Amino acid sequence: MNVNQVAENLALSHQEELVDLPKNYPLSENEDEGDSDGERKHQKLLEAIISLDGKNRRKLAERSEASLKVSEFSVSSEGSGEKLGLADLLEPVKTSSSLATVKKQLNRVKSKKVVELPLNKEKIEQIHREVAFSKTSQVLSKWDPIILKNQQAEQLVFPLGKEQPAIAPIEHALSGWKARTPLEQEIFNLLHKNKQPVTDPLLTPMEKASLQAMSLEEAKMHRAELQRARALQSYYEAKARKEKKIKSKKYHKVVKKGKAKKALKEFEQLQKVNPTVALEEMEKIENARMMERMSLKHQNSGKWAKSKAIMAKYDLEARQAMQEQLAKNKELTQKLQVASESEEEEGGTEVEELLVPHVANEVQMNVDGPNPWMFRSCTSDTKEAATQEDPEQVPELAAHEVSASEAEERPVAEEEILLREFEERQSLRKRSELNQDAEPASSQETKDSSSQEVLSELRALSQKLKEKHQSRKQKASSEGTVPQVQREEPAPEEAEPLLLQRSERVQTLEELEELGKEDCFQNKELPRPVLEGQQSERTPNNRPDAPKEKKEKEQLINLQNFLTTQSPSVRSLAVPTIIEELEDEEERDQRQMIKEAFAGDDVIRDFLKEKREAVEASKPKDVDLTLPGWGEWGGVGLKPSAKKRRQFLIKAPEGPPRKDKNLPNVIISEKRNIHAAAHQVQVLPYPFTHHRQFERTIQTPIGSTWNTQRAFQKLTTPKVVTKPGHIIKPIKAEDVGYQSSSRSDLPVIQRNPKRITTRHNKEEKL
């Protein structure tokens, strides 16, 4: 039997059991509810019976016909031929009053415009920057007049704000002062009679507390400092925890070395401040050293050392680490030597020698050292002793020493040349004195008379020069009065250096008299250039192997080798024939000092060398386009032929002639100097309105030599003056008269970025 039929029969039997009631029978609410519950139960029963079949039946979709009228049940608009709108859907809603809230929401949505697309991140950041720039420029623009005023001020004295004087109570002011004069005592008596507050405090404790209490700004600053201190403390604690977790041995090794260096510096500082505490620290360090020495960790016997030894051949850092460990092992295993009593007695004499530093011995032993003037006295004493023993062989020995030193060291020091000149002059004077005793008295008388004539003539010439006020470099001939001195003519090769030597000048009358006595002897009173000629003549006979270049080695500056124009050479004796005006001792000392300082400076040669280098650098360079293996065989050791080089060589065109071509003593650089351009003014400075004003100011001297004392002080007044002992605080808005904004503009921008972007978009649309 089918299940459906069973269900229908059950339903019919259930209906038969129901009692038929009349139509007008009144039903209560409970009865209505019971009927609805019965229907619901009946429906559930039918569904349960249907499900007993065991097969899932598919529910067929109900078909509905499209209606031409648009309502909440049908939204088709095919029949009307128009698009479906929101108003069509809202027509049935208008009639019903129960959907008031829905109507309001729909009206609100209808009134709103289409939502714009959100801007990308780059555009938002750009808008933020623009707004922040405009706000910041607006805030900073209020400082422009103050900056302009400070720039225009002739002088700024910091601190700008005047310090307020400290308000002291009257009892503090009168604590160290008493009435001494009768008038003061009378005034104080009157005040005491009237009970005026002379010594009583004017302020109550509450008023004092209010004055001493910090302001709101100070409290905020104090709180900010405490917050910063707490943040730093937490930061360092986190850093310490992080470092504690690091397992790298290399990191801990580096940290350990850094701590050791820091401890060493602190120990040195502590040793200067508190020696007793430093001694205790020294004992702790010694105990740590003993413990480290007992552990013997630095013998290159561990796993780490063995692995580093394998890589030391290829890795430089590993090799360096091995060397450091070996050095540490050597330092730790080193025994501390303690001297015994016998050794102390024996070494007592050596202590005194060790007190003198080795640097002093090096200075005395090293003749070619940095300061040869320190051993000048020692060398001069030894030379004088040698001249006393054998005065006849002095010139030959001196020449031999000069030649030997030149052969060993070509670049002779300036100080050595001055020392040799001084020693040779001393030897010449002593030799002349010895030979003067051996000559007959007759020759002495004749030579004394001739020397007196020379002196008288020289005095007359000096008197004439004083009267006529002639120039110092005027020449006067004294051929008839000067005694004829017999001397050998030097060889042609030696003539040129002799002529280039400068004649020595006579400074005082006492020196003239001494020279008059010495000039009477033949081959003795000649200065150094003549003696050098005689020595150069003797040295080739004695030593034929000596080269001729040594004759011209003593010459410091040879003008003939450098100057482009040849100057006429004049043969002149070394005996002074001209007397210049008497000079002061200060000028003489100054000239002697300059002479000693620039004795060995070959400035002309250096200058001409520098000029040649500048000319070569300014010449245009030829371009060589030769390639190896192009048209010829190429390879290692093969060079292109000269023909190929000439073929592929592009010669540079000759540049314009240099401005200093015909000026031997001038170098004119025609290229732009980058270093000088950095110091040149590109834009006219602020106070000036025309370039001529600036040039006139630069050209005007500001020294006290060309200006009065008052003008000099005004010109050299410093632009900024600071008072010593005063704290220069930054300028505030309250000091100038502005009100400082409590809230910054930038946080406002960061708090409301959407508001700024929408406003910016509206401005762009407008």
From Swiss-Prot:
It is found in: Nucleus, Nucleolus. Residues 407-434, 502-527, 545-555 have a biased composition (Basic and acidic residues). Pfam families: Utp14 (PF04615). InterPro entries: SSU_processome_Utp14 (IPR006709). This is U3 small nucleolar RNA-associated protein 14 homolog C. The modification Phosphothreonine is found at T204. Residues 396-405 have a biased composition (Low complexity). Residues 14-42, 365-563, 734-766 are annotated as: Disordered. Essential for spermatogenesis. May be required specifically for ribosome biogenesis and hence protein synthesis during male meiosis. Expressed in testis. It comes from Homo sapiens (Human). Transmembrane segments: none annotated. Encoded by an autosomal retrotransposed copy of the X-linked gene UTP14A. Evolution of autosomal retrogenes from X-linked progenitors compensates for X-chromosome silencing during male meiosis. One of its GO terms (biological process) is meiotic cell cycle. The keyword Transmembrane does not apply. The modification Phosphoserine is found at S28, S51, S76, S80, S403, S405, S443, S451, S567.
